[in-house]
């Protein structure tokens, strides 16, 4: 039987190769040219059995996938240039599109079978692209660009975009991003000159939003066609998206192509400064257009970057890392059950995890750096997508500090505390003292050293905990063994911490551990849950439609993210989506307009340990009740929300820019542009559906300005806190927004410095008063009069036919919190 199967596969391989050479002529097919749309490419007639044979040949593998050609070539470059890693980085950044195709000098080092397997994905995609040109389909996109479009490197660009973004972007968004990126490459290589900027290029050629979407979808079709079905198009909840065809997981892993921007750097990133592009080596090139500020390009936000922030970025970029070799080896051998566990429980991240492992193998023997960017609020983000301290749990676990240290007494203590934190089975350590967490590790040393499968999988973060256990094994053998693992402590709902300090609210400060005289940790989330459940239950008595809510009992795991994001002004819709992502789903089919539609009900826990079934509309009602009652016991939070939103509305009424200064001197301007909806008809599997696309214009989107002001202010305060901290710190510091990482030996000092900088943020900077003063200065600059009537300030707005007077918001009343007390009583501010 095995012999017959081998012959069948060889025959299939032969047929497929000849099938490519004769441009698919033995398939009786045609492309539907009527009502053409980029997403309507579909094969009307083809031999399904032949495709099935091809699919079986390409996916029947009995061994683990090999390292992709792309990563193999990067490994070769790193090895050949290990004494000049700047040169290695330069080659990777400038030649990355060539690394996926064997050249004369590297082909001898690559097994021909690997090359053949890679061609099964990229080769099929490129042949399909050439087919679309020969059949005239590219003429429907652009006659002027059709010859430029058929370029194999654009297949690699599209492929790298798909791998990085398929799971978190809608299909129309992917279409646009790929089409836009390819158009930009065509412009740079063939059209760039002194007479036309890229901004003018689309207008000159009459390329609208639909053009970019259609061009991108042509390339996506090369990976979703029945002849190359690596991804599957799905349509759920009125949204088109992609999912990976599970039969092709091994082929995908052996065909990786990753943009250098998503990879670590092997030399220190270039220095950023005013007017000087830093980061990637390619930024020395005049054609490069990388910016330190990323995200929100559709809008007109502004940030004036300070000298201090540039220095902080350069300091973070200079930190050196290496792969955790012990963990990588463990996950590939006796610890492979963790990856299998993720494959079963987190299917949507499995491919990304496998890519992360392959990148770790590639950089195993090479030190690396993690390039960072900022957004317009000053928030810091690592650029490396698959391997970085702001990435997935696996990504973080595989990173070690390049310079290790023997643990001192404080380092050992906080290393144990961190071990308990990442185990945290069932959230049991949320209220425990540091000493209790330390004691838990001492009591479980035998289990930790044994690394039993069941024990590891009970951890909240299995890969991080496995890395901890492996280091503990080394420490048992040799207490002087240097430790390279970074450890992290997390702030208690940092948004509320900022509001508590801003308002000097003593009670609120206690709940979020700014002030805590005891050894038990206050759990802000648990404090709010009883009142939320009470409001939900009482709604059943007030409204008959809420009768199902009478026994609902939501727990901490369901409400933690809701409460945390409410401090960032999350909407009822946002709460609904968070609940739906956490609750157990029950699929059902309903009939609408004669069509079957898949929808979900949700199982919501009750007081008696059972569940009540709610449909989507009932979950929305539940979210609305939560939103209305979540902060009722803290009226000062409502007062600051009211103040900031009213201030924003006046800015909008007067049509002047919404701007503020952060305590560290950053000048920020918030400005959302209006988006317009464009509908395109998409033909998918013979059925017409409508995709909603958005384009942005320069008009202000007033509806977004008001709800965005609170999260943007809080994010900017988080961002202001970090530069103060990093600027005063001489060792490793790894920021994950409101989470702080360093070597275990430095964690005690880092926690102290976090408190000191937080105190400095609010003791010397009366932030709310400065916002109010800045607002009044802006009114003066725009020659807008403030009038006082009976002790109340009004702004004079010219109306028709008379002047209108709009009352100015009054600053919230301050409380009795002494921020200096945080120094000695804020031990659990980060825990």
From Swiss-Prot:
UniProt cross-references to InterPro entries, sorted A to Z: DNA-dir_Rpol_C_phage-type, DNA-dir_Rpol_phage-type, DNA/RNA_pol_sf
The UniProt record lists the keyword Cell membrane: no
Enzyme Commission code(s) on record: 2.7.7.6
Any GO molecular function: mitochondrial promoter sequence-specific DNA binding
Main enzyme class: transferase
Active site: 490, 560, 738
Gene3D superfamilies to which the protein is assigned, alphabetical: 1.10.287.280, 5' to 3' exonuclease, C-terminal subdomain
One GO term (biological process): mitochondrial transcription
SUPFAM superfamilies xrefs: DNA/RNA polymerases
Subcellular location(s) per record: Mitochondrion
Keywords: DNA-directed RNA polymerase, Mitochondrion, Nucleotidyltransferase, Plasmid, Transcription, Transferase
Reaction catalyzed: RNA(n) + a ribonucleoside 5'-triphosphate = RNA(n+1) + diphosphate
Primary residence: mitochondrion
Any one Gene Ontology cellular component term annotated for this protein: mitochondrial DNA-directed RNA polymerase complex
Similarity section: Belongs to the phage and mitochondrial RNA polymerase family.
Protein function: DNA-dependent RNA polymerase catalyzes the transcription of DNA into RNA using the four ribonucleoside triphosphates as substrates.
Name of the featured protein: Probable DNA-directed RNA polymerase
Organism: Gelasinospora sp. (strain G114)
